C-alpha cells in the first residue's frame, strides 16, 4: 500500500503513515530496486526520484499505556510460577533482566556465572529469509549470530541475576540439563513469533492485557528508572545512546545503583 502511494501522489501518503513506517518501506523498496538493477531487470531506481520531504506524516501516538502495568506484571508472573516449561521460564526471566528477546533465546549455559550471579550476553538469535531468484522469500530459519542489535559493542554486556532469576534458571536446568541453550522447546531454539504466541496465550489465561515481548523491555526500563540512573540503564539495555533509552521510559521509580535497578524487576522480594 505504501509502495503504491510512493509512486502515486503526495495526497496518498498525507497523514496516513508515520515517518518510521514510510522509512521502513523505503528501505525495503530500495533493496528490491538495487537487486533488480544488478540483475539488469531495470536500469534506474525510481524510489530515488521521490522527494520524501514533501510528505506530511501521521503523528506518532503517545503509547504510555501500551505497556505492562506493575499489577498486570505481578499477576502474570504469579500465574506463570506454576507452569514449568521453556516458554514460561523464558517469559519470566525476561521480566528480571534488561534483555532483548533475541538475546534471551540465545543464552547458553556457559554464559551463566553462578558464583558472581551474572549472565553474559554475547549473541542473539535471529530469523533470516533468503531472497530467491524469482523474488520470493524462502521459509524462515533461526540463526544465532555473535553480533548484537545495532552492530555496536554496546550490545555485549552482563546482567545481574536476582534470587528470582536464579530460581528460574535452576528450573530451566532441570528441564534441559544437557542442552546448549537455556531454552530449547522440543530441542530447538525458540523463535520470536512462537515466544510472543505463548506470551499472548499466557496473558489471556492470566487475565491481563497482552503486550509483545518488546514491551517487557519498556516496563523494565520504566520500573528501574530513578531520574538519575539513565546512563546505567542505557548500558544495561545495550543502547549506544541514552536518547534511545529515554524512548523506553513510561513510569518512573526512585532508586539508584546498578544492582538495585534489578531489584524492581519482576516481583520484588
Predicted regions and their residues:
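Single conserved hydrophobic/aromatic residue that forms the stacking wall/gate
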Residues: 1-8, 13-15
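C-terminal flanking helix
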Residues: 30-33, 37, 88, 252-253
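Basic, Lys/Arg- and aromatic-enriched nucleic-acid-binding interface segment
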Residues: 19, 23, 27, 38, ...
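C-terminal catalytic core of tyrosine-transesterase DNA break-rejoin enzymes
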Residues: 20, 38, 92, 96, ...
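Active-site/catalytic core of tyrosine-dependent DNA strand-transfer enzymes
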Residues: 70, 160-208
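Hydrophobic (often cysteine-bearing) scaffold residues that line and stabilize catalytic clefts
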Residues: 3, 21, 25-29, 86-87, ...
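Conserved tyrosine-mediated DNA breakage-rejoining catalytic core shared by Y-recombinases
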Residues: 52, 107-171
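Catalytic-site neighborhood detector that most strongly recognizes the C-terminal catalytic loop/helix
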Residues: 59, 125, 230, 237-262
Amino acid at each position: 500500500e505504501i509502495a503504491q502511494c510512493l509512486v502515486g501522489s503526495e495526497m496518498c501518503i498525507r497523514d496516513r503513515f508515520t515517518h518510521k513506517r514510510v522509512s521502513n518501506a523505503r528501505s525495503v523498496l530500495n533493496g528490491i530496486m538495487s537487486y533488480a538493477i544488478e540483475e539488469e531487470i531495470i536500469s534506474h531506481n525510481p524510489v530515488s526520484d521521490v522527494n520524501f520531504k514533501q510528505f506530511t506524516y501521521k503523528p506518532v501516538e503517545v503509547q504510555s499505556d501500551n505497556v505492562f502495568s506493575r499489577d498486570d506484571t505481578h499477576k502474570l508472573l504469579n500465574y506463570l510460577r506454576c507452569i514449568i516449561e521453556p516458554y514460561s521460564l523464558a517469559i519470566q526471566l525476561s521480566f528480571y533482566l534488561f534483555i532483548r528477546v533475541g538475546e534471551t533465546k540465545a543464552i547458553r549455559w556457559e554464559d551463566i556465572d553462578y558464583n558472581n550471579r551474572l549472565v553474559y550476553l554475547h549473541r542473539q538469535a535471529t530469523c533470516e529469509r533468503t531472497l530467491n531468484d524469482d523474488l520470493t522469500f524462502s521459509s524462515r530459519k533461526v540463526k544465532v549470530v555473535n553480533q548484537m542489535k545495532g552492530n555496536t559493542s554496546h550490545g555485549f554486556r552482563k546482567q545481574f541475576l536476582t534470587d528470582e532469576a536464579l530460581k528460574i534458571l535452576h528450573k530451566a536446568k532441570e528441564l534441559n540439563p544437557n542442552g546448549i541453550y537455556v531454552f530449547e522447546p522440543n530441542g530447538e531454539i525458540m523463535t520470536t513469533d512462537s515466544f510472543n504466541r505463548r506470551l499472548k496465550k499466557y496473558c489471556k489465561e492470566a487475565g491481563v492485557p497482552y503486550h509483545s515481548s518488546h514491551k517487557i523491555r519498556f516496563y523494565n526500563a520504566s520500573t528501574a528508572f530513578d531520574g538519575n540512573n539513565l546512563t546505567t540503564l542505557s548500558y544495561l539495555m545495550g543502547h549506544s545512546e541514552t536518547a534511545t533509552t529515554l524512548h523506553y521510559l513510561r513510569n518512573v521509580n526512585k532508586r539508584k545503583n546498578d544492582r538495585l535497578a534489578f531489584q524492581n524487576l519482576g516481583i520484588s522480594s
